[in-house]
Swiss-Prot record:
Plays a major role to prevent cellular inhibition of viral genome replication. Assembles an SCF-like E3 ubiquitin ligase complex based on the cellular proteins ELOB, ELOC, CUL5 and RBX1, in cooperation with viral E4orf6. This viral RING-type ligase ubiquitinates cellular substrates and targets them to proteasomal degradation: TP53/p53, LIG4, MRE11-RAD50-NBS1 (MRN) complex, ITGA3, DAXX and BLM. E1B-55K probably acts as the substrate-specific adapter of the SCF-like E3 ubiquitin ligase complex. Interacts with host PML-4 and PML-5; this interaction promotes efficient subnuclear targeting of E1B-55K to PML nuclear bodies. Interacts with E4-ORF3 protein. Interacts with E4-ORF6 protein. This is E1B 55 kDa protein. Contains a PML interaction motif that allows the subnuclear PML localization. GO terms for cellular component: host cell cytoplasm; host cell nucleus. The keyword Repeat does not apply.
Amino acid sequence: MEQNADMEPDRQVNQRPPRFRARGAGVRGRGRVRRSAFSRGQRRPIIRVDDLQLPDPLYVMQALQRDHTLEMPRGQVDFSWIEAEERRVGPTDEWYFEAVKTYKAKPGDDLQTIIKNYAKISLECGAVYEINSKIRVTGACYIIGNCAVLRPNLPAGEAMFEVLNVDFIPSIGFMERIVFSNVIFDCRTTATVVCCISERNTLFHNCVFSGPHMLCLDLRAGAEVRGCHFVGAVCALRSKGLYSIRVKNSIFEKCAFGVVTGSKASISHCMFKDCTCSIMLGGQGTIAHSQFIVTTSAEAPMNLQLCTCEGNGSHVVPLGNIHFASHREASWPTFYANTLVRVRLYMGRRRGVFHPKQSTLSMCVIAAPRGVVQRIYLFGVYDATCAIMQLGEAGNAASERLCTCGFRHSTPSLRATYVTDTRIDRELNSQDTAEFFSSDEDNF
């Protein structure tokens, strides 16, 4: 600091009077550009690759174009400015998530207007936000919940959030889809509401859905749900259309319907506890590294009698705890390394062979119609206490049940028959082999 004192004679150092000191011979400067050398409104110079003098043993730096520059990071800007700039010059890869300013929303603010103007909003930690009207999201939206509570005050069946595919979403890195993170959806009243109806690809990260929600998530354009917790909901997640969904690291507890989807689904590292129907899969999918546990059959919602319909109600069958609906063209889902305890698995008519490899079926029942039980392959499966049953019609007996479509149907009663010829003959196949070995165990 004393070496540059001749450049700033009026500056005081440690409250001492200024003094003038000449730079001695052979004393170099500090080698950095002082900020005062540029005007206040002038931008910092662009650092180009040629100026860095990086080592280039492979001679690849010469092939870089002049527009490949390293620019110093800029400050945050408003989302509205980025949106207007993209409308003017078109999409670019210049903006990223960290460059967008975050708006601090407070309880009582108009969330619909704030989301439209700022897109990236942050809620107060632990605050309670009363939702008195439906919030329509038409463009970009990124909500940082900070464990804030969203409590609805809406009529029965009304949605808290409705994501519409109306406005375009600017090309901002890591903000390409709708995001809800660390939000608690709490429903304490008797009025059942829907948390979110989405017609865009949406991400729900580490959210909690607590209370008697009629439907937590109605996903119509694909979504990803990870690290979420669903408690006491009538239906936790429902997907329609041809879009696929992905659910991982989530917990479903005491829900009448867990995941109901007619399209492709990927479910991994999830836990389903005391759900009347944990999964109803109508299309192809993958279920891996998940747990399905039933602890009681007398308490709600396990005492409910449910069903599912096919062909607009023309064919109705009872609903199992894990239900694979019949499909003419779809194959059986990939079922790998899952744990089932006291679970009833229903299998409709599909193509191929069902092989629950490396899965544990403890005190479970696999129920399937005639002609399907012969397609169950139990090689490499822990099936000591698992029963396989073939279902058939039991006359004209029927009962009315609640269906996955939301209506009630007359469901025929079925007759079950034990089947044992699908098991592996352990007198000929030893268990002291590589049958129960996995390549993933080499890492432990």
